């Protein structure tokens, strides 16, 4: 009797395991690769939009700016990581450093339209060699895939565009003044200025993907964020 019960339980475990192994195949039977890709891209597009709205000023035409996005959140705020900052603060330039950090973040926030345009174009044409693996790759699989595939292009876009905002908000001139103060204090007149574009872009990109991962996870795990129940995003992600 005990042997029969044991064999019965063993068969149940085997069947259950087999069903779990077939889950990916089940989704593939329900949806084509093109449909899964479309659903992944809808999720990516929604996550990017939510990220841009959280971190950047996307459209201020006729609207009052209600927040300072990157700057408002300690989790995403862009800081000066250059070695001269500690020296400046120690010599009484805390207010000037704080002012520079503020306008530096504002410059990053003003890149919202450019960031939105970059990702809208990128996601529109995005393909995945094995879309089903991305679908079942975990709560941040889309973000990680885009990070791997498109981060270098994203960085290049920001490196090209951020200087425009730096000039508009006097980031460059303010930074130059603080560098000069540093040179006066230390006597270290470096022939080349300390760069500020690269560390700013690096922090922007890190913050962007960090926030996008959170938004993707929310979409994957919350049916209310998946749109119309008859839509492709909802139908595909409801199989997870």
Region spans (language model):
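A cross-kingdom marker for long, charged
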Residues: 197-240
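An amphipathic alpha-helical core segment
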Residues: 153, 157-205
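Mid-length scaffold segments of soluble, non-membrane domains
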Residues: 95-165
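C-terminal motif of bacterial Sec signal peptides marking the signal peptidase cleavage site
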Residues: 15-18
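Residue-level signature of catalytic and energy-coupling elements of molecular machines
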Residues: 51, 127, 223
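Sec-dependent signal peptide recognition
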Residues: 3-9
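N-terminal Sec/ER secretory leader and immediately downstream segment
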Residues: 22-105
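Non-transmembrane, aqueous-exposed alpha-helical and coiled segments at domain scale
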Residues: 21-38, 136, 210, 216, ...
């Amino acid at each position: 009797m005990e042997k029969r019960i044991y064999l019965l339980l063993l068969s149940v475990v085997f069947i259950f395991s087999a069903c779990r192994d077939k889950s990916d195949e089940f989704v593939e039977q329900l949806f084509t690769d093109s449909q899964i890709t479309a659903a992944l891209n809808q999720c990516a597009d929604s996550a990017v939009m939510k990220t841009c709205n959280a971190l950047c000023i996307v459209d201020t035409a006729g609207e009052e700016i209600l927040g300072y996005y990157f700057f408002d959140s300690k989790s995403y705020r862009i800081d000066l990581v250059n070695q001269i900052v500690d020296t400046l603060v120690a010599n009484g330039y805390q207010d000037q450093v704080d002012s520079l950090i503020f306008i530096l973040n504002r410059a990053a926030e003003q890149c919202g339209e450019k960031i939105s345009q970059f990702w809208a174009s990128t996601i529109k044409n995005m393909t995945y060699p094995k879309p089903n693996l991305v679908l079942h790759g975990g709560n941040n699989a889309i973000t990680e895939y885009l990070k791997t595939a498109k981060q270098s292009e994203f960085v290049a876009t920001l490196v090209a565009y951020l200087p425009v905002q730096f000039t508009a908000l006097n980031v460059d001139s303010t930074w130059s003044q603080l560098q000069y103060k540093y040179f006066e204090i230390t006597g270290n007149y470096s022939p080349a200025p300390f760069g500020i574009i690269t560390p700013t872009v690096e922090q922007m990109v890190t913050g962007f993907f960090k926030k996008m991962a959170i938004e993707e996870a929310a979409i994957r795990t919350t049916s209310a964020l998946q749109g119309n129940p008859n839509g492709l995003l909802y139908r595909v992600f409801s199989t997870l």
